[in-house]
């Protein structure tokens, strides 16, 4: 797993879509993946899967700067499992550099 990051409880995190979460007012983009937008085919399913994964907390956020939209770019782990990798393997996400 990446650096120490921040350990959060599941109730503190909300899925915005399949590759973006919210912690308070902070929007966090999951690094390394892209999922369909909510209005696109597969977007709702990806968001629901991410929501279910987050409920399995605790959640570790390992920041890697910000993206072009100002969102925190981070590796996200649930119970030490990489969320991006889980979503890719399960077919909800594609790799994104």
Say what each PLM segment does.
Residues 1-97:
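Small beta-barrel nucleic-acid-binding modules, primarily SNase/OB-fold domains
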């Amino acid at each position: 797993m990446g650096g120490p990051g921040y350990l959060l409880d599941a109730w503190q995190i909300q899925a915005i879509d399949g590759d973006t979460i919210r912690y308070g007012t902070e929007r966090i983009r999951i690094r390394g993946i892209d999922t369909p937008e909510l209005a696109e085919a597969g977007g709702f399913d990806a968001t629901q899967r991410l929501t279910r994964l987050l409920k399995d907390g605790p959640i570790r956020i390992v920041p890697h700067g910000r993206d072009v939209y100002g969102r925190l770019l981070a590796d996200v782990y649930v119970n030490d499992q990489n969320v991006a990798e889980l979503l890719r393997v399960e077919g909800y996400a594609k790799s994104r550099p």
